[in-house]
Amino acid sequence: MDRNMKKWHSYKLSDVVRFNPSERLLKGEIAKKVPMDLLQPYTRGISGFEMASYTGGSKFRNGDTLMARITPCLENGKTAYVSMLDEDEVGFGSTEYIVFRNIEGITDNKFVYYFVTSPWFRDIAVKSMVGSSGRQRVQQAMLENLVVNLPPLAEQKQIAGVLGALDDKIELNRCINDNLAS
């Protein structure tokens, strides 16, 4: 075992991450909506939003992670980090999202995103799916009860910082390629 990992501890995931945290949006309230088609596979950012009347669905804030819970969207890598809302703004989206939120002082929001997008976690989520063919969904309760090893908060922030810098470079290259193509 790596000597740095000696400081890691085991937790039930729901003890260190909030699942679908409660937020308030009134029926009919106009808010930013992120439909499933705006989550790009294996891309941290959200490519856009619609202004729509809230009629239901998952609710989230900046810093939350959205993960598709239905096939084939999960297998296709539809997971994103919310950062396009204004301060204290609540957005909403598909009922087919699981929303993950860090717990202040315990987990780092960007580390939560990278943890949820890790092949290890995604594989567990995919294997937990149940339902009829073509309409299978992740069993959220199984994820909530999953025992995970996590580093201390300071190390989570360091890990997320390194991975975030790599994602920033990928996004910059994507923008350069888009400009060259146009």
What is each of the regions a protein language model found here?
Residues 15, 111-114, 124, 145, ...:
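Short, solvent-exposed alpha-helical surface patches in well-structured domains
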Residues 89-98, 130-160:
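A short glycine-rich beta-alpha junction/loop motif
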Residues 117-122, 126-129, 147-149:
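Well-ordered mid-protein domain cores that form the structural environment of catalytic cofactors
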